[in-house]
Swiss-Prot record:
GO terms for molecular function: NADH dehydrogenase (ubiquinone) activity; quinone binding. It is a multi-pass membrane protein. The keyword Lipid biosynthesis does not apply. It is found in: Plastid, Chloroplast thylakoid membrane. Its main location: plastid. It holds the Pfam family Proton_antipo_N. One of its GO terms (biological process) is ATP synthesis coupled electron transport. Belongs to the complex I subunit 5 family. This is NAD(P)H-quinone oxidoreductase subunit 5, chloroplastic. Coiled coil: none annotated. Keywords: Chloroplast, Membrane, NAD, NADP, Plastid, Plastoquinone, Quinone, Thylakoid, Translocase, Transmembrane, Transmembrane helix, Transport. It catalyses: a plastoquinone + NADH + (n+1) H(+)(in) = a plastoquinol + NAD(+) + n H(+)(out); a plastoquinone + NADPH + (n+1) H(+)(in) = a plastoquinol + NADP(+) + n H(+)(out).
Length: 746
């Protein structure tokens, strides 16, 4: 066992040869390197598979031996300072290693097909390999300096991948936004590391925890300064894990390729912030004010992410805000000291969200053949719909991921979510109300995404009832419009169906888009002159096997990964696999491992949470079920006229919520107004001062000297005798002034 741990330092370096060789090959031998593109893909998957096997073996050993292993090498710079670097293997490291490698391998397989058409195929895999290497180095680091080094590398790789299609201005701006936002967090993290080193004199995790505990117990540290340093450490995870108010970069990060969105949201970029808070929890837990701040930021992010997801029309942005909300749940759990539920939720969310993102990528890949390669169209849920019979495997996988994120048993997210909700009830009733309400909102917006994407008919060919071409009828009232509109209060269905026969009614457009090999043509019946008319339309096809295989594997994870946290005894919840694995970390946090609810209380809480989720699904179904089914009941929409004033208030509320969600809570607008525009205004003023004042003085001296020289040259006629006369005159005047001041002293 000890022999195995001694070789753990090699884990981050196993995948590293691929990005290095790819970089050298593309620089020196581009033709040969590109001709072997599939070989590089296979090599990347093979090397990461080795790391996965190694990680699983370490986790199994830790379950049975319950140990923490650390190995450190010291580099002495002088007698007063030495830099130590090494690796740290504990349950948290093992969990993160498995998440990174399993999701990473599936994303690599998926990307081989998804990025096959892209000219930057090899560049993408080079970035991806370096990304996984950086994340592996981060989770195995033994001290804060190493963490910060790999923290920056993870950020750099994410910026490169977010701006992968840098020729698109939107992608380039998203890359810059992610970079600038994370600069704030990274600067805070660096200040916190330096402050903590000034207090303790060490960067090593275990030394830090022990020294800080002793200083607090002996009252030998300024608690205010220690709290400030701890908060600065927390600022880094706030930005990296997209917590309020530094969350604004995450939705725009969807401009990168979809496989990267899956990796960032499941096991790398945003998971890094949760990992660091979990790693530093023994430090934070002895500072109650910091724990409360962590939980407060978490609960705000939970609610904000859920409300901002309500009206998104871009399928990836909707999932991005969902990630933001779920990361808030994890941060809330860590702030409450619920170490095990937080990590359990990190695991279940990683596989469920990776499944959803890869599913959305499969949908986008299929839709591109119909609507073109514009993200505004291929990712727009309002142009989707009716995909169930065209992409059945993708639909099934996406439905399982959606149900998991809704918290429906026995899927993965149900088990971890319930533990956080139970702990929030004990921590704060207000936090519990918000957390439970957000669970219902999660079910609502996730099923909204599912219904708009898969149910009904393909809305690309849909024409609204006014006869004007529109993206979809959903844009009238169901939050999928490109611009703000009020609900039509005078809309009635019966007059529409009893109009003059000379007028034509069609629910589908005449225009079709460019056809590619990834489409099928089908005959569809439309309503035209109240008779039957057959037309041929083109629909998406199911994706290739290399795209479907990773989704099916993630589907299995989503179905069964929750079992690692399910107890198999009736006395308590202390004999599940996850608790057994986390025993060393739980002991380090001095938690009472016997403080668990019984099965009866668990069933009560589970019934309540599932009821909330089902209610959210029911509301989503009522609002977003296919409109065509309501044609069977012609009084459905006309019954709205009986609402009178209540209907008006309801519409105002709907538009208020829509405007809040569609405009991202006005937070981006606030940052743009208060920060971006003010900084630009200040920059313009500084530019004016620099060019007009500073440069003016410098240029003025030069121009004056030039002018005096030219005048002198003109007067003297360029004669040497005149220059000598002026020189002697200046010397004489200088001597007279010196003589005058010298004799004045006497």
């Amino acid at each position: 066992m000890e022999h195995t741990y001694q070789y753990s330092w090699i884990i981050p370096f196993i995948p590293l040869p691929v990005p290095i060789l790819l970089g050298i090959g593309l620089l020196l031998f581009p033709t040969v390197t590109k001709s072997l593109r599939r070989m590089w893909t296979f090599l990347s998957i093979f090397l990461l598979s080795i790391v996965m096997i190694f990680s699983v073996y370490l986790s199994i050993q830790q379950i049975f031996l319950s140990c923490i292993h650390q190995n450190v090498w010291s580099w002495t710079i002088n007698n007063e300072f030495s830099f130590e670097f090494g690796y740290f293997i504990d349950p948290l490291t093992s969990i993160m290693l498995i998440l990174i490698t399993t999701v990473g391998i599936l994303v690599l397989i998926y990307s081989d097909n998804y990025m096959a058409h892209d000219q930057g195929y090899l560049r993408f895999f080079a970035y991806l390999g370096f990304f996984t290497t950086s994340m592996l180095g981060l989770v195995t680091s033994s001290n804060l300096i190493q963490v910060y080094f790999f923290w920056e590398l993870v950020g750099m790789c994410s910026y490169l991948l977010i701006g992968f299609w840098f020729t698109r201005p939107i992608a380039a701006n998203a890359c810059q936004k992610a970079f600038v936002t994370n600069r704030v967090g990274d600067f805070g993290l660096l200040l916190g590391i330096l402050g903590l080193y000034w207090i303790t004199g060490s960067f090593e995790f275990q030394d830090l925890f022990e020294i800080v505990n002793n200083l607090i117990l002996n009252n030998r540290v300024n608690l205010l300064f220690l709290t400030l340093c701890a908060f600065l450490l927390f600022v880094g995870p706030i930005a990296k894990s997209a917590q309020f108010p530094l969350h604004v970069w995450l939705p725009d990060a969807m401009e990168g390729p979809t496989p990267i969105s899956a990796l960032i949201h499941a096991a790398t970029m945003v998971a890094a912030g949760i990992f660091l808070v979990a790693r530093l929890l023994p430090l934070f837990i002895v500072i109650p004010s910091i724990m409360y701040i962590i939980s407060l930021i978490g609960i705000i992010t939970v609610l904000l992410g859920a409300t901002l997801a309500l009206a998104q029309k871009d399928i990836k942005r909707g999932l991005a805000y969902s990630t933001m909300s779920q990361l808030g749940y994890m941060m809330l759990a860590l702030g409450m000291g619920s170490y095990r539920p937080a990590l359990f939720h990190l695991i279940t969310h990683a596989y469920s969200k990776a499944l959803l993102f890869l599913g959305s990528g499969s949908i986008i890949h299929s839709m591109e053949a119909i609507v073109g390669y514009s993200p505004d169209k291929s990712q727009n849920m309002i142009l989707m719909g009716g995909l169930t019979k065209h992409v059945p495997i993708t639909k099934t996988a996406f439905l399982i991921g959606t149900l998991s994120l809704c918290g429906i048993p026995p899927l993965a997210w149900f088990w971890s979510k319930d533990e956080i909700l139970n702990d929030s009830l004990l921590f704060s009733p207000i936090f519990a109300i918000i957390a439970c309400s957000t669970a219902g909102l999660t079910a609502f917006y996730m099923f909204r995404i599912y219904l708009l994407t898969f149910e009904g008919h393909l809305n690309t060919y849909f024409i609204n009832y006014s006869g004007k071409k529109s993206s979809s009828f959903y844009s009238i009232s169901l939050w999928g419009k490109a611009e703000e509109k009020k609900l039509n209060r005078n809309f009635e269905l019966v007059p529409l169906l009893t109009m003059n026969n000379t007028k034509r009614v069609s629910f589908f457009g005449k225009k079709t888009y460019k056809i590619s090999n990834n489409v099928t043509n089908q005959t569809f019946i439309t309503v035209e002159n109240f008779g039957l008319n057959t037309r041929t339309f083109y629909y998406p096809q199911e994706s290739d096997n290399t795209i479907l295989f990773p989704m099916l594997v993630l589907l299995l994870f989503t179905l069964f990964v929750g079992t690692i946290g399910i107890p198999f005894n009736q006395e308590g919840l202390d004999f599940d696999i996850l608790s057994k694995l986390l025993t060393p970390s739980i002991n380090l946090l001095h938690k009472n491992s016997q403080n668990f609810v019984d099965w009866y209380e668990f069933l009560q809480n589970a019934t309540f949470s599932v009821s909330i989720a089902l209610f959210g699904i029911f509301i989503a179904y009522c609002l977003y079920k296919p409109f065509y089914s309501s044609l069977l009941n012609l009084t459905l929409l006309n019954s709205f006229k009986t609402w009178s004033s209540k209907r008006i208030r309801w519409e105002k509320l709907i538009n208020l919520v829509y405007n809040w969600s569609y405009n991202r809570g006005y937070i981006d607008a606030f940052f743009k107004t208060s920060l971006t525009e003010n900084i630009r205004r200040l920059a313009k003023q500084m530019n004016f001062f620099d060019k007009r004042i500073i440069d003016g003085i410098t240029n003025g001296v030069g121009i004056t000297s030039f002018f005096v020289g030219e005048v002198t040259k003109y007067i003297s006629g360029s004669r040497i005798s005149f220059y000598l006369f002026l020189y002697l005159s200046y010397v004489f005047i200088f001597l007279m002034i010196l003589f005058f001041f010298y004799f004045e002293k006497f």
